[in-house]
Amino acid sequence: MKLVPPVRVLGAATLALTLLSVPSPAAAFPGFFASKKQEPVKTYSTQIAVMKRGADTVVSVMPDYEGPLEGFAMVMLVPADVTTDKVTTLKRDFIDRLDTLSAPRFHEYWEQDPCDAGPVEQEWERNLKVEGAAGGPLGGGAPTPEAGALKPAKELFLDVKAKQKEGEYKFTLLEPGADVTAWLSSHGYKAPEGAAAALKPYGALRPLVAEVDPKRIELVGGDRAQLSPVRFATTQPFDTIPSRLGLLNAPKEQELIIFVIDPEARYETKNYKTIFPPTNIQLDFTAKERMGEFYNALYDLILQKHPQSFLSEYAWPSDGCGQPCATEPLMISELLSLGADVFEQSVPEAERHPKPPELTKEQEKAFKDSIKDLKPKEKREREKTFKQERATVVERQGLLARHKYVVSRLHYRYDGKTLPSDPQIGTAPAAAGGTAQPKGKDGEASTEVKTGDVNKLQTRYNNFHPWVPVIQCQTPDRYRWGKAPRDYRGLRKTWITDDLTRKSHTQIKPTVVVKTAIPDLGLVPAPAASAKPEGAAGSAATAAPEPAKSGCGCRAVGSGDASERSVGATLALALAGVFGAARARLRYSRRT
């Protein structure tokens, strides 16, 4: 059920920039921890990346852990065909990138200069231009290999190696149906209460025990373990996530986030309702750097209305990153590290190492002209290098073409009562939403999510910075929303929901910060009259010089006739000098 109604923007508010917050994962663990000590072990979060291609599936699990830093082990369940050579350890960076790439985001729109008739530019258009100039994040758009004689192809500079890590684990694979608790006990570990009963339904899976070397643990905050992701590959179906096991160490609610990377399809849960969260709605500026707190509270409201519902928060091609991008698109080396290297093993040799096409006469002449002044030995070396480079470029172009995917993000918050069965994932129709651009004084934009042929779905929350300086033209073109001005000195960052498991659910109230009506959730902002329209949001046809709006850029101070607006503008300009330092967006006024 779609939760996002049509947008009507009612106001804006600002808050001074604070310190950056560091993104942290949030999800639920498909396994459990056992310790050699009496101190309780807790887990609040884990993220799961499931990468699929044909019969092959590669799963990466990054757990959260809170407990003693010595003498503990992690138990996961894997398909029966998994062997130790199919289990490896990754750097956390790869899962962190997926999280940042797909997380719900806060985007700021700025009213463009009403006296500048040029086209409106968006922040992601700037990003795309940079990518195009550099051959794209995966090397797409690089010169053809035939042009390598005169200009090096960008594919030559790609990192095309999968990265693995010498992790902190000692892996032991038990046979399906093995007595895991007995094995743990014989090795000095104490399984959590109820482990034996919880494991019974999973007799067809193999227990994977990862004993943790305390000397290799990375710490965050000085005393909390930050464990590396564990990756395994299988040719058996892996569409059911054994998440109920994570309840054995759960002190309260857990957040389950599943990333699915598939060549063609978006994914949803098949045994739970999947809905689209509100997207493309307006938020007060105070939520900008507290997106985790806001989203926690919003999801609580969603679950009250739609209990036991997964959120489909993101579905986008892997060579993109949303609008705006919170980080760069996934690199080919990252895709290989997350599982594409396994898929490459089944690619025929001729496809992995194709022959370069023959040079045309013009290309051959251009190359010979470029080496005609070299000494014989240098000429031979250059010819050999050129041949190798052409072969490398063709191979890498094929590699890039083979590894294009759709990245889906599913999110669920649960406890023992709201997870009666393990979630099952499956393909779903393509979805697009959260990308419509705002128009007019109120920044009206469609909040609808539609299914169709293209995956361009994101969860975006908007904030608007109306034009502050005095308008000095006769026919201003108002309310064109785009990217920040070139001379804006504030932090150019896309803020995302982060560290949900450790953020408050009550400090940021959706009833206060949401400025778009969402009747389905009972969120109906106060009528415009109570907030008063913004002073500078008057008629676009007002002749220059038009009064500026409230210098603080908050809600309006008045909407009277021209003389009243003129007085309000004078007061606004005075206030700008007082509060300018506390309002990053007032740097916008430097343009006048």
Where do the language-model regions lie?
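Surface-exposed, glycine/proline- and aromatic-rich loop segments on solvent-exposed faces
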Residues: 51-117, 185-209
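Short acidic, Pro/Gly- and aromatic-enriched capping/linker segments at domain boundaries
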Residues: 140-166
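N-terminal signal peptide c-region/cleavage motif recognized by signal peptidases
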Residues: 21-23
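Cleavable N-terminal signal peptides
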Residues: 15-16, 25-26
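Accessory, solvent-exposed terminal regions and/or long lumenal/extracellular loops of proteins
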Residues: 30-42, 194-535
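C-terminal low-complexity, Ser/Thr- and acidic/Pro-rich disordered "stalk" regions positioned immediately N-terminal
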Residues: 520-560
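N-terminal secretory signal peptides that target proteins for export/translocation
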Residues: 1-7, 588-592
